[in-house]
Amino acid sequence: MDSEYITWIDISLRPTDTCTLIPFLKDMESHLGFKYSEIVADAGYESEENYLFIEGNGQTAYIKPQNYEISKTRKYKKDISRRENMEYHADRDSYICRNGRELTVTNERRSKTASGSVSVKTYYRSPDCTGCPYKTECIKGNNCKTPMEKRNKVLMVSKTMSQKRAEDLERITSEYGTMLRMNRSIQAEGSFADVKEDMNFRRYLYRGKAN
């Protein structure tokens, strides 16, 4: 959307929005012959891969983080299991939990997306959570076969994603970023409403993309 005009549209076989953003931007740029300097999108499009692509393409992301709304709730802010609510010590690259125990780096793992993008996850572990009074609040996952009394706290963190999300959050909460998000909501949702109501469209049924 640009000034209430639909400048580009696409259909995708992918069930989620996350994986559709990069192909959409590439396709739009190749057909229009130019690229927008700012990419404004809702939370469904947030991912580490999308952040890195937009930055590498010389553009600026204004994407609403997936945890943006829930992060403002009291429940989220009081959830001691979340790393966001723990103390982080950059000099030691470690987290301090509610009970004052230190979670240090034990290993890193690399994973690859369907498109070939590689993400690095850093694992932080507490050496011993025995006798911790906050254990059931802090360690989640009832399907784990290891008994609770034998389990220790583990955090899995993508440092790149955390950094890009923090940078993006600063942008979208600025006066300019807030204006862009409001404008996106008005234009995109308004146009969608026009198509449904004024043109009386309810559902699109296609067999493949060829037709």
Model-derived features: positions:
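Anion-binding and metal-coordination hotspots
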Residues: 1-211
